[in-house]
């Protein structure tokens, strides 16, 4: 607990046998667990206990996994450092003076510290991959629709996916095997994962694989990060892969488009937290608007408030076309860029994060710095593509991750390539 990786420690025993029998799993605290607090890292939901399990939780338990706790996170998933949590920041187990990444920082820290064998996070703009990179573990964001979101407390519905965090690529793939597949409770899910065997794909055989390297996702990155990334590419070439330069000009606008869309969706999704149906009460003194305002001012932290306000502004009548519409057009451009690129390459590679893990407290006073750290991860969410972060050594004693992005439902390809980086 010295890392503050868990908000709630508990034991939820799974089935007597199954592929996860004897395996401990930590679950991010925005994934519903019946009768166990699911706070989303917020004062607003500090006492909330869901009346049902998320589909992925049911999958875990049916596979024999044992849930050992609900992990700390940036409030409602809004952050890149796990410092915006109402329950305090999580520390990076590699260096406790630094952030673990976010928003699934508690999940990554728990796995890296050995407090859980595996973990679940959610990834809206990099929230599984960023903490995996910063904590030196593996994090995988599945294709949108591969894993059920039923029971995930929504931040930005069109962007987010639940994904595994593990010490190894094979471990992440094994957990993906358990949670992937269609769900009658989530109309966005597809059949693609029903018969897949992701763990068997982690062979590391990249002979003949073509890897695209976009300059747009290395420009401006820390030199130490780029050095480790280039070394990983050299290792892949030595194993028979080919690397080629590709262009993704749309990625220059990805962060801006992502934040407009995510904040806009958040302003709608979080409207339900008004102190009446959910959340802390506003006291019901005065009129309803005052009551709602009091409840939300008391229940939400600064970053969540900022994003709700910006999202509401972007959707407002006078600015919808200027911001939200243009962001959606940029999103379509990102998707088109990737589609054209995957006509020529099998995977796209970049550093997961452009910088090394910041010191605790460094980003809180400069939210723009925090937003820009998502430059390499947000494009995969905008394009609804699978992406994995795998450790690629360290720089000055701090972990560096390599990100591999694949075409839709190309999880097996990126898992195979990630296994080669890992070796």
From Swiss-Prot:
Its EC number is 6.3.5.7. PROSITE patterns: AMIDASES. It catalyses: L-glutamyl-tRNA(Gln) + L-glutamine + ATP + H2O = L-glutaminyl-tRNA(Gln) + L-glutamate + ADP + phosphate + H(+). Gene3D superfamilies: Amidase signature (AS) domain. Pfam families: Amidase. One of its GO terms (molecular function) is glutaminyl-tRNA synthase (glutamine-hydrolyzing) activity. The gene is gatA. PANTHER family: GLUTAMYL-TRNA(GLN) AMIDOTRANSFERASE SUBUNIT A, MITOCHONDRIAL (PTHR11895:SF7), TRANSAMIDASE (PTHR11895). InterPro entries: Amidase, Amidase_CS, Amidase_dom, AS_sf, GatA. This is Glutamyl-tRNA(Gln) amidotransferase subunit A. GO terms for cellular component: glutamyl-tRNA(Gln) amidotransferase complex. Keywords: ATP-binding, Ligase, Nucleotide-binding, Protein biosynthesis. HAMAP family: GatA. The active site is at 28 (charge relay system), 103 (charge relay system), 127 (acyl-ester intermediate). Allows the formation of correctly charged Gln-tRNA(Gln) through the transamidation of misacylated Glu-tRNA(Gln) in organisms which lack glutaminyl-tRNA synthetase. The reaction takes place in the presence of glutamine and ATP through an activated gamma-phospho-Glu-tRNA(Gln). GO terms for biological process: translation. Heterotrimer of A, B and C subunits. Belongs to the amidase family. GatA subfamily.
